[in-house]
Amino acid sequence: MYDIIVLAFETDMTRVVTFNTGNEGTGPAVPEIGVKRDRHSLSHHNGNKEALEQLSRSDEFNVQQFSYFLDRLSKVNDGGGALLDSTVALYGSGLSYGNSHGTTSLPLVVAGGKGIGIKHGSHVDYNQQTKGFDGYGNGIGVYHSPVNSKAHFSNLLLTMAQKMGVEVD
């Protein structure tokens, strides 16, 4: 699928794509890489070692595929440089801790967009920017209420849209 997306961008058939590697609610089992159960059932692992290993394999596979996509974008010239530099790609999950459906501290990666002002080379943990935050070791509570209530996922999406030239407030 990533090859088709690159081709669509390269030929200017579209400038926007949304692609899910699997439904957030189920996500397929991938027996070829040793993932025997769907992502949803694995996310409710309750600390089960086998489930956690399969979840890790699934995550690793998906990140490798995303890396492949970025590499392909970096090798295509769009006339002004690498296609990756004029593309913003977001990878991540709508849950930070699937065992309890935690929706804060989302694990997200923003890639590309160097040519439109996206700065890279850092890890941004919005919780660490909050006075009094003393780490994630305080248990599951951090996944249910954000430490930094001003760090909204919608702000990231808004910034991405604005960088791509969409006029929105």
Label each residue range with its predicted role.
Residues 1-169:
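Ligand-binding pockets and gating/stacking loops
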